Amino acid sequence: MAVNAQLIKELREITQAGMMDCKKALEATDGNIEDAIVWLRENGLAKAAKKSDRVAAEGVALAKEDDKKVVILEVNSETDFVAQNEKFINLIDEIANVLLASNAKTLEEGLALKTNSGETIEQVLVSATATIGEKIQLRRFTLIEKEAGNTTTLYNHANKRVSVALNFKGTLDSTDAYNLAMHVAAMSPQYKSIDEIPAEFKESEFSIIKAEAKEDPKLQGKPENVLENILKGKLSKRLSEISLVDQQYVVDESFKVGQFLESKKVTLIDMVRYEVGEGIEKVVTDFASEVAAQLGN
């Protein structure tokens, strides 16, 4: 049947799909709007599947809270341009709200949660991939339960690429808690304390330090026991750089973070810091290769 402009406009407003896609959907379904929506979804899912092997290393990190929990999550896109899109930001906020209302512990459980539309988070992300034209994925999330007598705080950097959630045993002034979250965002500690650093990591770092020492002319000819102490000192310094309680507190450098926490009579229970794309290897292509790929060459 002939498809008129009004039907195309109506379908486009409902689905946010492209004009030509809406026209094809209506032609394929004899002008039936509901069937056309299904047709677009089915074809959208097919398109989204083709994008599943792309690398999504951009995106947004977000920490959010309600009366009972704090959630911190990272949702990835392929480009920074999409990550700044208002619809993408709203999608992440919706996902955060669904996670806050849940007790999900794993990524699999999170993706299976139902949204207000009745679709799962995974289905919503697949639909977003089809509509936006980029691979969109929930990479990770952490839920922290609030408990009476404890202090939770969160920090979202203005660039939307770094978020932090902290949970303290004991009562901490909100300004101090927020400043500590900003410290974590800026200094990116990997562990709460040196005691939490895995033995394998320590051994690997010590091996690297030994190899570096062999190339350092200042250390040549040192007695073995003296050299060993120097190397242990270097290891301790390196480990303290990635241990939160051993870092100098950026807000007041007269304290280490651990000393500051002791002065406030609180203990850090949970520390979660997400930075968009950390640990993801980005694919870099030159312009000619990108054009060739799009042309199927």
Swiss-Prot record:
SUPFAM superfamilies: Elongation factor Ts (EF-Ts), dimerisation domain, UBA-like. One of its GO terms (molecular function) is translation elongation factor activity. PROSITE patterns: EF_TS_1, EF_TS_2. The keyword Cytoplasm applies. InterPro entries: EF-Ts_dimer_sf, Transl_elong_EFTs/EF1B, Transl_elong_EFTs/EF1B_dimer, Transl_elong_Ts_CS, UBA-like_sf. CDD domains: UBA_EF-Ts (cd14275). HAMAP family: EF_Ts. Associates with the EF-Tu.GDP complex and induces the exchange of GDP to GTP. It remains bound to the aminoacyl-tRNA.EF-Tu.GTP complex up to the GTP hydrolysis stage on the ribosome. This is Elongation factor Ts. It comes from Mesoplasma florum (strain ATCC 33453 / NBRC 100688 / NCTC 11704 / L1) (Acholeplasma florum). The lineage of its organism: Bacteria, Bacillati, Mycoplasmatota, Mollicutes, Entomoplasmatales.
